[in-house]
Amino acid sequence: MRLTQGAFSYLPDLTDAQIIKQIDYCLSRGWSVGVEWTDDPHPRNAYWELWGLPLFDVKDSSAILYEVNECRRLNPEGYIKLVAFNAARGTESSASAFIVQRPKSEPGFYLERTEAEGRMIRYTIHSYAVARNPEGSRY
């Protein structure tokens, strides 16, 4: 099951040339670009690990792609995404985010149903990868 988080998630994986174009677009808008990674693909896992130091003042797309490739080298089976942050007053939020690497195999999720008080039923989504393996060895 292909994880669909962020922009371009329904499209085929981006090439490095396409990633450079997206980085250039983000930088042309004045956004800071950062690299994040995780091995926990849960949809509510909004806090991925920041790769290295924030790249707030980096204006060279090839330097950012270098950081992406270093993250790929050390996390070959993890999810890696680029996040563009708009620091403009009144916005101060992520303006774009997209996955630039994913594991070769994405096992997907299962739905757990729990009966609660009365006739209430609660549903929880769990990742097969997280359920099977500890953090750091999920893929």
Swiss-Prot record:
Q: Which Gene3D superfamilies match?
A: Ribulose bisphosphate carboxylase, small subunit
Mind telling me which InterPro entries this protein's record contains?
A: RuBisCO_ssu, RuBisCO_ssu_dom, RuBisCO_ssu_sf
Q: Does the keyword Chloroplast apply?
A: yes
Q: Which domain of life is it from?
A: Eukaryota
Its main subcellular localisation, reduced to a broad class, is plastid
Q: Which GO terms describe its cellular component?
A: chloroplast
GO MF term list: ribulose-bisphosphate carboxylase activity
Where found? Plastid, Chloroplast
Which biological process terms from the Gene Ontology are attached to this UniProt entry?
reductive pentose-phosphate cycle
Q: Matching HAMAP family, A to Z?
A: RuBisCO_S_bact
> What is said about its interaction partners and assembly?
Heterohexadecamer of 8 large and 8 small subunits.
Family (UniProt) = Belongs to the RuBisCO small chain family.
The protein's name is Ribulose bisphosphate carboxylase small subunit
